[in-house]
Amino acid sequence: MKNFLLLAIMLFPHLTWANVISETGERQPVNIQAIIMFVLFVGFTLYITYWASKKTRSRTDYYTAGGRITGFQNGMAIAGDFMSAASFLGISALVYTSGYDGLIYSIGFLIGWPIILFLIAERLRNLGRYTFADVASYRLQQRPIRILSAIGSLFVVALYLIAQMVGAGKLIELLFGLNYHVAVVLVGILMVLYVLFGGMLATTWVQIIKAILLLAGATFMALMVMKIVNFNFNTLFKEAIAVHSRGEAIMSPGGLVSDPISALSLGLALMFGTAGLPHIIMRFFTVSDAKEARKSVFYATGFIGYFYILTFIIGFGAILLVSPNPSFKDTTGALIGGTNMAAVHLASAVGGNLFLGFISAVAFATILAVVAGLTLAGASAVSHDLYANAIKSGKANERDELRVSKITVVILGFIAIGLGILFENQNIAFMVGLAFSIAASCNFPIILLSMYWHKLTTRGALVGGWLGLITAVVLMILGPTIWVSILGHEKPIYPYEYPALFSMIIAFIGSWLFSITDNSQQGMQEREQFRIQFIRSQTGLGIAQGKTH
């Protein structure tokens, strides 16, 4: 069970730790400290869920914690939702193996946050209530836009959940000795408990606690590494170059992507996909007003940026302290557990078994924080967008909507467990890439254009959104990851790893073309309503949810 925690840290919601599933290694010895910390963490978070359940009485409480989260708290929770085990272990592993390239990768994740800060956060909060579909459908036709938005959200949520569950099961099995199926079921049960009873309030505090633990653990590791080199970066880099097999090449870029098109596609997916992730967007509705939403992004960007700096130091520290140490290698000379275990081995090197146990607990917290946010986002898409607004046309009562949401949480739990078991032996890196690509190709264009382009109509949004979604899925299937590696064909039809460059362009062109050619009465009315939406987005007048709700 202790090893269960350690695995969590490697759980990989982002593309970075794709190859963890394919890597094999020896299981770690039993760590009693990790077992104790695991039990303490689960007990504490279940108590938080019980406390949150007493305060969660309405639909607003369940979806958005009543809008009572402060900007600082929300910024910390967003960071907890975004700083995945992949970010910690995956990027650290990239730095460990490739050096400078790992930093380039982390910048791709980080750069999306200023986009959210300057383009989206304020207007999103002023226009929406529970989901981003509230914003996209503000002046457009409710039913078709909400269906598209919900399906796009569910695609992203499902792919992320698969990544989380498979990653959790594999790593728990590797590190803790737990049976894979047992590990997946355990994560699924805890995920359902947090969201089912505690809603957004419990999810928020689990994410905040996880962020604090992860930042504290990473800070300690980075400080210990810098202490060894007398807090001199030149010494760190020189000694890392001296022991790394690639030598000075680790200080140069160029090893992560095979061609400029793939690099650009990946960059676009990481940059703009962040602004279309439903579980991230949903967090902006937990604060009282646009001012707090801006603060949320400001604090989140600071925490996340600081964290990525730490991962860079941790990666080079692993080169220095882990790679030359035979105790972290198996009989073949490979790193035990694969390169994604570099940061975990570094925890043992700088802090012994006690700190290794702490990092194991943080790993488990990382899994639960991310899957809880994903589950709530998926449940709200079904209950609020599909049931309450698309099916019931906005006439569903609050009690029925909450019932549907909680039923959806349980169903998502079963689906997550089932998919985790089904995809046990599958390389799931492409799922994470597809999740970002779908978010960038379907959700992001609809959100951006609906808020900023007065000529957007329902017809344009639907055509552009569906084209972006379908193109992203089709190109990923025809690409080398699925078409060649999984389906066994000799050559891919689409030669690049990621589709975002093309699917995003198609989505924007489709939205533009079918909007400017829309001369219907409905289209003209939607253009006229943009001014009302613009005033609301800038001032928050008529805002429907917050502390006073």
From Swiss-Prot:
Q: Where in the cell is it found?
A: Cell inner membrane
Q: Name one GO molecular function term.
A: symporter activity
The record describes the protein's role as: Transports acetate.
Transmembrane as a keyword of this entry, yes or no, is yes
The record ties this protein, via Pfam families, to: SSF
Record's bilayer topology term: Multi-pass membrane protein
Q: What is this protein called?
A: Cation/acetate symporter ActP
Keyword annotations for this protein? Answer: Cell inner membrane, Cell membrane, Ion transport, Membrane, Sodium, Sodium transport, Symport, Transmembrane, Transmembrane helix, Transport
One biological process term in Gene Ontology? plasma membrane acetate transport
An annotated GO cellular component: plasma membrane
Entries under InterPro entries matching the protein: Cation/Ac_symporter_ActP (IPR014083), Na/Glc_symporter_sf (IPR038377), Na/solute_symporter (IPR001734), Na/solute_symporter_CS (IPR018212), Sodium:Solute_Symporter (IPR050277)
Main location (coarse class): membrane
Q: Where are the transmembrane segments?
A: 32-54, 75-97, 102-124, 145-167, 182-204, 211-233, 263-285, 298-320, 361-383, 404-423, 428-450, 462-484, 494-516
